[in-house]
Amino acid sequence: MYKKILLPTDGSSYADQEVERVKNILAEDGEVIVLSVAGLLTSSAFQSRKKVKKVNDKLKKDAQRYVDNMAAKFDDDVKVTKMVVRGFPSDAINEVANNEGVDLIVISSTGKSGLHRFVLGSVTEKVLKNSEVDVLLVHNE
């Protein structure tokens, strides 16, 4: 049984599978950290700062919604910490895992469909390669 589990989410439809896995392996007095990494768009010569801020605000709002939706799938007696951070997903996931002292990262084998599926699959691969803690890979059905 694991006492502190990091559960990253990208808002994909596989959350139920991941949550069920966590429920089965979380210690009775354990904690789950539900994390979403909001991308960060930087301004360029082609985009106004106002537009960039608007996009970044939407990315953060979406990430918060993903975290809230996944956290709501746990029973009230489970300690759930919700986090939204900015950065590159694989780096941010491993950084949070190290900083928060988690025992396990539970992550989906793929994320959203289309191009996102390819990109998030590579995020999973980088987390697996660079993690300093155990990683449970949930194959999507």
Spans of features found by a protein language model:
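Active-site phosphate/pyrophosphate- and oxyanion-stabilizing loops and adjacent acidic/basic residues
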Residues: 20, 68, 72, 125
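General small-molecule cofactor/ligand-binding pocket signal
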Residues: 33-35, 81-85, 136
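Structural beta-alpha unit
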Residues: 72-105
